[in-house]
């Protein structure tokens, strides 16, 4: 009897979790700006996904940011890999190439992050909060203040955040909210200094010949970039005790 009860409880917990996730989008529509975005963009999104043979709503999304190109790529789940849905330009930008290491340094972070929260009443229209500082950032900034409150948002104004056009953040926000409602609890946001093709990466390293720590950091990011480029599957990464990003398993 006890195994049966345990199994039933497990089923109830799974059902409750799925119901809560599915309610997420409905709750978001209770906010004026999200409702406006939904009313103006949902039919277009549905049509575009259908024309491209993509499932709607998306079961998962993945964001890649390239600072030098001012580019935000949004990928969506397609079968067992990811398909590029759209490439957005970001219009508000501060700092230079390289990671964020201190409060007030104006830098847009670089590394492997996740969306931690949705802000439907942002001062910048709509925003997605990132988990900066992550484990790697905290190790590299021990004894200092790494800063925080890093978002992807609208209004084309930025001090260390990723800012896009208002209609673009509406679309990104809706698709991320759809994926969250479909059960994706961790929405990855990978931020690179530039598109790390072999040619561009070699040129990037030539700019930091006397900065081996920065060159090593960018080499870690390239490993994650290359892993995704091989099969369009989001790589699994971990942070080791020294703060280095490591690929898990056979992705190397």
Regions found by a protein language model. Give the residues of each.
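Positively charged n-region of N-terminal signal peptides that target proteins for export
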Residues: 1-4
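Bacterial N-terminal signal peptides
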Residues: 6-15
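Sec/Tat signal peptide C-region and signal peptidase I cleavage site
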Residues: 17-21
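Cell wall/extracellular polymer interaction/catalysis modules
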Residues: 22-159, 167-187, 196-252
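A conserved hydrophobic position in a structured secondary element of the catalytic/binding core
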Residues: 164
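Hydrophobic transmembrane alpha-helices
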Residues: 192-193
């Amino acid at each position: 009897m006890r195994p049966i009860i345990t199994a039933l409880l497990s089923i109830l917990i799974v059902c409750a979790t799925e119901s809560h996730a599915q309610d997420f989008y409905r709750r978001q529509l209770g906010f004026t700006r999200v409702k406006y975005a939904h009313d103006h963009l949902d039919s277009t999104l549905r049509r575009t996904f259908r024309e491209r043979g993509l499932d709607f709503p998306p079961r998962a999304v993945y964001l890649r940011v390239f600072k030098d190109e001012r580019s935000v790529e949004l990928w969506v789940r397609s079968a067992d890999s990811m398909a590029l849905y759209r490439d957005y330009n970001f219009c508000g930008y501060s700092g230079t190439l390289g990671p964020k290491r201190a409060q007030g340094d104006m830098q847009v972070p670089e590394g492997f992050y996740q969306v931690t929260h949705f802000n439907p009443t942002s001062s910048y229209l709509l925003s997605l909060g990132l988990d900066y500082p992550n484990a790697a950032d905290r190790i590299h900034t021990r004894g200092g203040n790494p800063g925080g409150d890093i978002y992807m948002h609208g209004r084309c104004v930025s001090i260390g955040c990723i800012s896009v056009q208002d209609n673009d953040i509406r679309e990104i926000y809706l698709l991320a909210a759809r994926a969250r409602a479909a059960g994706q609890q961790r929405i990855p946001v990978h931020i690179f200094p530039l598109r790390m093709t072999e040619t561009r990466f070699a040129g990037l390293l030539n700019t930091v010949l006397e900065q081996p720590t920065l060159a090593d950091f960018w080499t870690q990011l390239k490993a994650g970039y290359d892993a995704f480029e091989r099969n369009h599957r989001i790589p699994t990464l971990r942070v080791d005790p020294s703060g280095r990003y490591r690929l898990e398993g056979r992705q190397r």
